[in-house]
Amino acid sequence: WGDEGKGRVIDLLAENADIVARYQGGNNAGHTVVTEKGKFILNLLPSGILHPEVTCVLGTGMVIDLEHLAGEMEAIEARGVKVEPENLKLSDKATISMPWHKVQDGLEEDRLAKKGGAFGSTRRGIAYAYSDKYRKKTLRLGDLLHLDEERTQNRLHMILDAKNMELAGCYHQEPMSYDALLNWCRQQAAYFAPFICDVGAFLQQAHDSGKRIVLEAQLG
């Protein structure tokens, strides 16, 4: 399925919504929306972001490439679209697509290609982010708010040790340093902290008060 208008339907519904909540997927698919400001291609942001009165949510079930999201936000802001904590809320329980997820995706695709069995991956690390989510070996957005806590730092060490063993053992990659990882996390926290919240409580309150909520999946 593709190019038959799923995103267009969501955009039409978003015009009359109070909230558009994306609840799963990552940035390996997207949709195109055309407004009076031109054509926008969105991979992570819900199409409701183009409507100034709509609040958008990236929910718990998503895996979020934060660098891609920042680029998407800045690109539409440069064209006059408001992106602020008041109209974009990120779940504190959403999974972070870490830098190594794309690396691992690309390395595995290359390995399989040599054997004639490549999947045709987008190389954006979505499958690996979800895999680590269910193995409890990655971070959630809420962890960015607690980087100075010993518990979070211990978790970072545990996750990094496991990932370095995978990348070194399977793909002969040089290990990543803890300091570089912590610095990357701090950069993401500085940018995204104002947007991170308990979106479950936000949506429950909105539902109870009669707000119109549209749920958007990865493909529409």
List the predicted regions and their residue ranges.
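Non-transmembrane, aqueous-exposed alpha-helical and coiled segments at domain scale
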Residues: 1-220
